[in-house]
Amino acid sequence: MRTFVLRARAASTHSQTLLANVGGDAHSEILAHTLMNAIFVAQSHRDDVVVHLVLESTQDYSRTITFVAAEMRDIGGFHEQALLAKVVRALDASAGMGKEQMKAVESGITVRTQSFEKVVKELAEDGHQLYMMDPKGENIRELDFAQKPCFLLTDHIPMPKKSFNSLKRLGTEKISLGPTMLFASQCVVLINNELDLAGF
């Protein structure tokens, strides 16, 4: 199983604000693009992928929307609008939830009022090896992947420096995809390809 966590610091937890920011400063479309490249392949989808989208622009609590590819049904199409509709449905379902609550949205999709820090801590405690993108990290092609790899990505707003120490305590390893700074959705394509080539 391969896991991706996208920390979307600019993405609104209010569904209509999120949609209004597609193509805007918050770049809400990154959520759909990352989902698309993590889950779909030509004429099919990957069953071995879990994606956690952590939306942090909020009036109350962050929202973590989890997509378990193997359990998803009626995805609705390989395009931005269909995938954003899934995110919107999850956000609408989360309205009024208290802190650290969870709700099933539909088959394969859940939403939690949970922070990025809490999500990655739980993943680490569950045996996932955390990997964070860093131009100075170990070249991904020289990496011996752990059995439960989890890749941490961000939107256009970099990871806060204060997060680095907590991630380091969780055993996070820094890896590099090359010298060029890429979008999260592009990173996902390269990571999936490297895992495929490694026979993962």
From Swiss-Prot:
It is an enzyme of class 2 (transferase). One of its GO terms (cellular component) is cytoplasm. GO terms for molecular function: S-adenosylmethionine-dependent methyltransferase activity; tRNA methyltransferase activity. GO terms for biological process: tRNA methylation. Its main location: cytoplasm. NCBIfam families: PRK02135.1 (NF002560). Belongs to the methyltransferase superfamily. TrmY family. PANTHER family: TRNA (PSEUDOURIDINE(54)-N(1))-METHYLTRANSFERASE. This is Putative pseudouridine methyltransferase. It comes from Alcanivorax borkumensis (strain ATCC 700651 / DSM 11573 / NCIMB 13689 / SK2).
